[in-house]
């Protein structure tokens, strides 16, 4: 069974900040990448093309917005939670996930096995949060590791406690 690891990048006050080389390294080590439509569009527009060509990228979206016809991009539409359960059950490896909507989908449906939070030492302000979801159950997460990175960021890994 695949493990899904959600990567969250946030400021000290919990606001979203962009992913960096730490995400790139995780994506490279995984069997595939899982992102939402907004993240897909942002990556495509920032790179003027699709940079993640070494492995399959799954994009959770309401419809096909394929800008990368010749690359390894697959769109997850319809019942995304059910499709992701099937992907998770098929084979081994780690799925590296990123994006606010992706995070909410994974956490609201009990699909994330691990959360890696990179906290950047800045205050952003505003009402938007890096991770917003409607958790309404009693899932428990424990700290597996915490490390200060060379650039002053803090990397904390949380693992889900299974009942």
Which residue ranges define each predicted feature?
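Enzymes that bind and transform nitrogen-containing heteroaromatic metabolites
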Residues: 1-163
